[in-house]
Amino acid sequence: MTRCTADNSLTNPAYRRRTMATGEMKEFLGIKGTEPTDFGINSDAQDLPSPSRQASTRRMSIGESIDGKINDWEEPRLDIEGFVVDYFTHRIRQNGMEWFGAPGLPCGVQPEHEMMRVMGTIFEKKHAENFETFCEQLLAVPRISFSLYQDVVRTVGNAQTDQCPMSYGRLIGLISFGGFVAAKMMESVELQGQVRNLFVYTSLFIKTRIRNNWKEHNRSWDDFMTLGKQMKEDYERAEAEKVGRRKQNRRWSMIGAGVTAGAIGIVGVVVCGRMMFSLK
């Protein structure tokens, strides 16, 4: 698929869309304590097709644009089920386990899947406490239903600034949370069988909203990759700065300890000297 290389000026619609999407990504991958924790859906009304997308005289397939091109989120290799399966498997393996009942990936692991792993991991690190709380809500019943799943992800806060009901940040949050819960399920023999249900619920929840909203809001996996790389670089840079500050603080603490020890040594010498003179 070819991609236009339009000038990124403030008057360019594509630039404005990308700026909005970047803001969404930063909002959901931001510093803990400053960002909303909503990666659910505010209301069903948002998922309904808008009047601007009424059926035309010629019936078009879902995802097909006016010029006849197919959006990348309709490509088989980028089915949302593949993202969910890959991330669940990846997250479960992080806990030293295997999801032997995982569906296969007909097209194999894609670069977009690998980027989702990175983004999902970052998201979980920044929302670990919230994940624990929401996971407890979801696992409070013996068997998870789709209705319960929807209720839980809808009550994960409220991000009123989102323009798209399935923004990139919300997408990352849902898959990351699903992987976290799946890993928890695998730790219990009684819950292992429900990982498959969680996979189905997560895939259905996301896929429906992508189909209903991504075309209108000009979202794509291509843009996801571009923004994901930016966020990954920003995160790694911030982490490197933290490590640098910690090392510097340790050096200063060691210098401080050395100065203190030296001062104590000097005081000791002076005191001992005075004692020796007094004995004479």
Swiss-Prot record:
Any one GO molecular function term: GTPase activator activity
Chain span(s) of sequence motif BH4: 80-99
Annotated Polar residues bias: 43-59
Principal subcellular localisation of the protein: other
Organism superkingdom: Eukaryota
CDD domains: Bcl-2_like
GO cellular component: a single term: endomembrane system
Region spans: Disordered: 33-59
SMART domains: BCL (SM00337), BH4 (SM00265)
Topology class, membrane: Peripheral membrane protein
Cross-referenced InterPro entries: Bcl-2-like_sf, Bcl-2_BH1-3, Bcl-2_fam, Bcl2-like, Bcl2_BH1_motif_CS, Bcl2_BH4
One Pfam assignment: BH4
Placement of sequence motif BH2: 213-229
Compartment(s) where it occurs, according to its Swiss-Prot or TrEMBL record: Perikaryon; Synapse; Endomembrane system; Mitochondrion membrane
Motif (BH1) on chain: 160-179
Keywords tagged on the record: Apoptosis, Cytoplasm, Membrane, Mitochondrion, Synapse
GO biological process: actin filament depolymerization; apoptotic process; apoptotic process involved in development; defense response to Gram-negative bacterium; extrinsic apoptotic signaling pathway in absence of ligand; intrinsic apoptotic signaling pathway in response to DNA damage; mitophagy; negative regulation of apoptotic process
Record text on subunit structure and interactions: Interacts with asymmetric homodimer ced-4; the interaction sequesters ced-4. Interacts with egl-1; the interaction results in ced-4 release. Interacts with dre-1; the interaction inhibits ced-9 activity, either directly or indirectly. Interacts with dct-1. May form a complex composed of ced-9, ced-4 and mac-1. Interacts with dynamin-related protein drp-1 (via residues 280-502); the interaction is enhanced by GTP rather than GDP; the interaction is probably direct and may occur at the mitochondrion. Interaction with drp-1 may be enhanced by interaction of ced-9 with egl-1, but not with ced-4.
Family: Belongs to the Bcl-2 family.
The protein's role, per its UniProt record: Plays a major role in programmed cell death (PCD, apoptosis). egl-1 binds to and directly inhibits the activity of ced-9, releasing the cell death activator ced-4 from a ced-9/ced-4 containing protein complex and allowing ced-4 to activate the cell-killing caspase ced-3. During larval development, required for the elimination of transient presynaptic components downstream of egl-1 and upstream of ced-4 and ced-3 apoptotic pathway. Has been shown in one study to be dispensable in mitochondrial dynamics and morphology during early embryonic development.
Protein name: Apoptosis regulator ced-9
Organism: Caenorhabditis elegans
